[in-house]
Protein backbone atom coordinates (compact mmCIF):
# COMPACT_ATOMS: atom_id res chain seq x y z
CA UNK A 1 0.00 0.00 0.00
CA UNK A 2 1.19 3.44 -0.75
CA UNK A 3 0.96 6.24 1.70
CA UNK A 4 -0.98 9.27 0.69
CA UNK A 5 0.47 12.51 1.88
CA UNK A 6 -1.65 14.11 4.52
CA UNK A 7 -3.38 17.19 3.36
CA UNK A 8 -2.36 20.33 5.09
CA UNK A 9 -5.13 22.20 6.79
CA UNK A 10 -6.76 24.54 4.38
CA UNK A 11 -6.12 27.91 5.85
CA UNK A 12 -8.76 30.56 5.60
CA UNK A 13 -8.02 33.24 3.06
CA UNK A 14 -6.73 36.37 4.65
CA UNK A 15 -9.65 38.46 5.67
CA UNK A 16 -8.66 41.70 4.09
CA UNK A 17 -11.41 44.02 3.14
CA UNK A 18 -10.77 46.97 0.94
CA UNK A 19 -11.64 49.90 3.13
CA UNK A 20 -13.20 52.78 1.30
CA UNK A 21 -11.55 56.04 2.07
CA UNK A 22 -13.52 57.85 4.72
CA UNK A 23 -13.15 61.26 3.13
CA UNK A 24 -16.13 63.59 3.04
CA UNK A 25 -16.81 63.09 -0.67
CA UNK A 26 -16.28 59.33 -0.88
CA UNK A 27 -19.91 58.49 -1.58
CA UNK A 28 -21.23 61.89 -2.63
CA UNK A 29 -21.75 62.58 -6.29
CA UNK A 30 -23.91 64.44 -8.74
CA UNK A 31 -24.67 63.83 -12.38
CA UNK A 32 -24.89 67.12 -14.26
CA UNK A 33 -25.56 68.19 -17.81
CA UNK A 34 -22.94 70.51 -19.30
CA UNK A 35 -21.68 71.15 -22.82
CA UNK A 36 -24.31 68.79 -24.22
CA UNK A 37 -22.91 65.87 -22.21
CA UNK A 38 -23.55 64.27 -18.84
CA UNK A 39 -20.79 64.19 -16.22
CA UNK A 40 -20.47 62.26 -12.94
CA UNK A 41 -18.96 64.77 -10.49
CA UNK A 42 -17.55 64.24 -7.00
CA UNK A 43 -16.36 66.94 -4.57
CA UNK A 44 -12.65 67.86 -4.50
CA UNK A 45 -11.89 66.36 -7.91
CA UNK A 46 -11.05 68.07 -11.16
CA UNK A 47 -12.68 67.53 -14.56
CA UNK A 48 -12.23 68.80 -18.12
CA UNK A 49 -15.26 70.41 -19.80
CA UNK A 50 -15.58 71.99 -23.21
CA UNK A 51 -14.51 75.64 -22.94
CA UNK A 52 -16.53 77.47 -20.27
CA UNK A 53 -16.82 81.22 -19.93
CA UNK A 54 -14.82 82.67 -17.06
CA UNK A 55 -11.27 83.48 -16.12
CA UNK A 56 -8.90 81.29 -14.15
CA UNK A 57 -9.92 81.43 -10.48
CA UNK A 58 -13.56 82.34 -11.20
CA UNK A 59 -16.46 80.43 -9.64
CA UNK A 60 -18.98 78.70 -11.92
CA UNK A 61 -22.31 77.18 -10.87
CA UNK A 62 -24.07 74.38 -12.73
CA UNK A 63 -27.81 74.24 -12.13
CA UNK A 64 -28.66 71.44 -14.61
CA UNK A 65 -28.27 68.67 -12.00
CA UNK A 66 -29.89 65.40 -13.08
CA UNK A 67 -29.14 63.29 -9.98
CA UNK A 68 -27.69 63.88 -6.52
CA UNK A 69 -26.55 61.12 -4.18
CA UNK A 70 -25.22 61.34 -0.63
CA UNK A 71 -25.35 59.53 2.69
CA UNK A 72 -29.05 60.36 3.06
CA UNK A 73 -29.90 58.76 -0.28
CA UNK A 74 -30.32 59.68 -3.91
CA UNK A 75 -32.54 62.32 -5.46
CA UNK A 76 -33.47 61.98 -9.12
CA UNK A 77 -34.73 65.00 -11.04
CA UNK A 78 -37.48 65.12 -13.63
CA UNK A 79 -35.53 66.37 -15.58
CA UNK A 80 -33.52 68.41 -13.03
CA UNK A 81 -33.23 68.24 -9.24
CA UNK A 82 -34.95 71.27 -7.72
CA UNK A 83 -32.60 73.78 -5.99
CA UNK A 84 -29.51 71.62 -6.62
CA UNK A 85 -26.30 73.42 -7.57
CA UNK A 86 -22.77 72.20 -8.23
CA UNK A 87 -20.16 74.89 -7.52
CA UNK A 88 -16.96 74.76 -9.57
CA UNK A 89 -13.71 76.72 -9.62
CA UNK A 90 -11.93 77.30 -12.94
CA UNK A 91 -8.36 75.99 -12.65
CA UNK A 92 -7.08 76.43 -16.22
CA UNK A 93 -7.97 76.80 -19.87
CA UNK A 94 -6.18 74.22 -21.97
CA UNK A 95 -6.29 72.38 -25.26
CA UNK A 96 -6.96 68.70 -25.71
CA UNK A 97 -4.81 66.26 -27.67
CA UNK A 98 -4.49 66.73 -31.41
CA UNK A 99 -6.84 64.65 -33.52
CA UNK A 100 -5.72 64.04 -37.11
CA UNK A 101 -8.32 63.59 -39.85
CA UNK A 102 -6.96 62.20 -43.12
CA UNK A 103 -9.19 61.75 -46.14
CA UNK A 104 -8.04 60.16 -49.37
CA UNK A 105 -9.56 59.01 -52.61
CA UNK A 106 -7.57 56.18 -54.09
CA UNK A 107 -6.36 56.46 -57.69
CA UNK A 108 -7.38 60.16 -57.84
CA UNK A 109 -4.40 61.93 -56.20
CA UNK A 110 -6.86 63.55 -53.79
CA UNK A 111 -5.65 63.79 -50.23
CA UNK A 112 -6.69 66.05 -47.37
CA UNK A 113 -5.13 66.17 -43.91
CA UNK A 114 -6.70 68.19 -41.12
CA UNK A 115 -5.86 68.53 -37.43
CA UNK A 116 -8.04 69.66 -34.54
CA UNK A 117 -7.43 70.46 -30.85
CA UNK A 118 -10.48 70.93 -28.65
CA UNK A 119 -10.53 73.94 -26.33
CA UNK A 120 -11.07 72.69 -22.75
CA UNK A 121 -11.56 74.15 -19.29
CA UNK A 122 -10.25 72.30 -16.24
CA UNK A 123 -12.48 72.82 -13.19
CA UNK A 124 -12.41 71.69 -9.55
CA UNK A 125 -15.69 70.67 -7.90
CA UNK A 126 -15.88 72.69 -4.68
CA UNK A 127 -19.30 71.69 -3.38
CA UNK A 128 -22.63 70.10 -4.20
CA UNK A 129 -25.61 71.78 -2.55
CA UNK A 130 -29.32 70.96 -2.47
CA UNK A 131 -31.70 73.64 -1.24
CA UNK A 132 -28.77 75.80 -0.10
CA UNK A 133 -27.41 73.09 2.21
CA UNK A 134 -24.22 71.17 1.42
CA UNK A 135 -24.69 67.53 0.50
CA UNK A 136 -23.82 65.14 3.30
From Swiss-Prot:
One of its GO terms (biological process) is translation. One of its GO terms (cellular component) is ribosome. One of its GO terms (molecular function) is rRNA binding. Residues 1-21 have a biased composition (Low complexity). The keyword Membrane does not apply. Residues 1-25 are annotated as: Disordered. Pfam families: Ribosomal_L21p. InterPro entries: bL21-like, bL21-like_sf, Ribosomal_bL21, Ribosomal_bL21_CS. It comes from the Bacteria. Keywords: Ribonucleoprotein, Ribosomal protein, RNA-binding, rRNA-binding. NCBIfam families: L21. Part of the 50S ribosomal subunit. Contacts protein L20. This protein binds to 23S rRNA in the presence of protein L20. Belongs to the bacterial ribosomal protein bL21 family. This is Large ribosomal subunit protein bL21. It comes from Synechococcus sp. (strain RCC307). The gene is rplU.
Amino acid sequence: MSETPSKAKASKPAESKAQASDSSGANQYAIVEASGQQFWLQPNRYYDFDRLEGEVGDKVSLKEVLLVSGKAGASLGQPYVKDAVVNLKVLAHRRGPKVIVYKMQKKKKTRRKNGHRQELTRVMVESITVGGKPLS
